[in-house]
A protein has these predicted regions:
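N-terminal metal-binding scaffold of metallo-dependent hydrolase/deaminase domains
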Residues: 1-39, 50, 375
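C-terminal cap of metal-dependent C-N hydrolases
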Residues: 4-10, 334, 346-379
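Divalent metal-coordination and catalytic microenvironments
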Residues: 6, 21, 26, 49, ...
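Metal-coordinating catalytic core of metallo-dependent amide/deamination hydrolases
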Residues: 39, 128-230, 234, 272, ...
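His/Asp/Glu-enriched, well-ordered alpha-helical/loop segment
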Residues: 68-69, 73-81, 85-87, 214, ...
């Protein structure tokens, strides 16, 4: 397949440029001017006058585990069994037939990080998925992508044994310390050949200790952001700061630490105290300070299929336009560790391609075609 004559988003070129895209076997083979039709086989898509981007990526979502329109019976986001549950994995709660999936794809969203809810201090393991497939295993790109933890209002109000920020920080530290102890005991048992009983939760924590995956930290208030950074630095952990609602008030502090930020949701009522400071201006301020940002819908808090709208509103509020496009494509791919496959239109990447009628941030634009790994999802 060749997609011809479109305005293709190429970050190394500084924006949209006229190019053709050659796709074979679900992969982008070449992005160049004047690709010969003979290279395409029978399928040629004329995108003259259209804008073409990578498939959009939401770096923090509850799609497929908090199902749209189904109520509490299909909400597998928060388990409410304990404050610390590293043994839970979102892959075991994913329903590929969530109604939101089809709507999201038709709005240009092709991948997402599916996370446990935020009412436990340690909620479980996040999985990165492509929004295509009939079983979870077909969807999963990274089964164990991050350890979800939460600070502030949500775990405080959940009613577990500890009800203060101090107590919740202690529980997270204790979980990490338990994992360190588990790692040492496992290594000693391997040396002397003694019996060692595997613990599912602690096994899930080991990639975090080894810096293979990050701590995916739900934080809104500025002091909670600082606590998450404090704990990450204490243990030398990778960290992704999620929500960061009050980030604009501590931008100088954030800029001194090399942690990416996933901003949002923003386009919703101030439903709790911690959301009082939410504003679209935060994205531009953090970006100008050199902080890598992603933009999230936090589905189903706000709909994932309006992800491009949230990015556009951030641009309207001061975020650079190209940085706004990166915040829903390239940046989340890098933060989620899937940038070898997703996030940019270049040779070797998956053919996750969205064709828009106008610029993606134009109020009147429409998604005309979506290809996910080369498959036309809009048929």
């Amino acid at each position: 397949m060749i997609i011809k004559n479109g305005q293709v988003l190429l970050f190394e070129e500084g924006g949209f440029v006229k190019r053709d895209i050659l796709v074979k076997d679900g992969k982008i083979i070449k992005v160049a001017e004047g690709i010969s039709p003979e290279e395409a086989g029978e399928e040629i898509v004329d995108a003259k006058g259209k804008f073409i981007t990578p498939g959009l990526i939401d770096a923090h979502s509850h799609i497929c585990i908090s199902e749209e329109g189904m109520g509490a019976i299909a909400d597998d986001c928060n388990d409410y069994s304990d404050a610390v549950m590293p043994y839970l994995e979102t892959i075991d709660g994913i329903n590929p037939f969530d109604l939101a999936v089809d709507t999201a794809v038709k709005a240009g969203v092709t991948s997402a990080c599916v996370c446990p809810g935020s009412d436990s201090v340690v909620g479980g393991i996040c999985s990165v998925v492509k929004l295509k497939g009939k079983v979870a295993e077909e969807m999963v790109l990274e089964r164990k992508a991050a350890v979800k933890c939460s600070f502030g209002e949500n775990p405080k109000r959940a009613g577990y044994s500890f009800k203060t920020r101090m107590g919740n920080a202690y529980l997270l530290r204790k979980c990490i310390e338990d994992a360190i102890d588990y790692k040492h005991r496992k290594e000693e048992a391997a040396k002397d050949g003694s019996y060692f009983r595997t613990d599912i939760g602690m096994e899930n924590m080991l990639p975090l200790l080894e810096k293979k995956i990050p701590l995916h930290a739900h934080v809104h208030r500025a002091d909670d952001v600082c606590t998450a950074i404090r704990i990450a630095k204490e243990y030398g952990l990778k960290l992704v700061i999620v929500h960061c609602t009050d980030g604009i008030s501590i931008v100088d502090f954030l800029s001194k630490h090399d942690y990416p930020v996933i901003l949002g949701p923003t386009m919703y009522p101030r439903s709790k105290l911690e959301s009082m400071g939410r504003c679209f201006e935060t994205a531009g301020v953090l970006n100008k300070a050199g902080i890598k940002i992603c933009i999230t819908a936090d589905h189903d808090v706000t709909p994932i299929y309006y992800l491009s709208v949230y990015a556009a509103q951030s641009v309207r509020a001061g975020l650079d336009e190209i940085e706004g496009l990166k915040a829903v494509t390239k940046n989340p791919a890098e933060v989620l560790g899937i940038d070898d496959r997703k996030g940019e239109l270049m040779a070797g990447r998956d053919a996750d391609i969205v064709i828009w009628s106008k610029h993606p941030f134009d109020y009147d634009t429409k998604v005309e075609k979506v290809f996910l790994e080369g498959q036309d999802m809009t048929i």
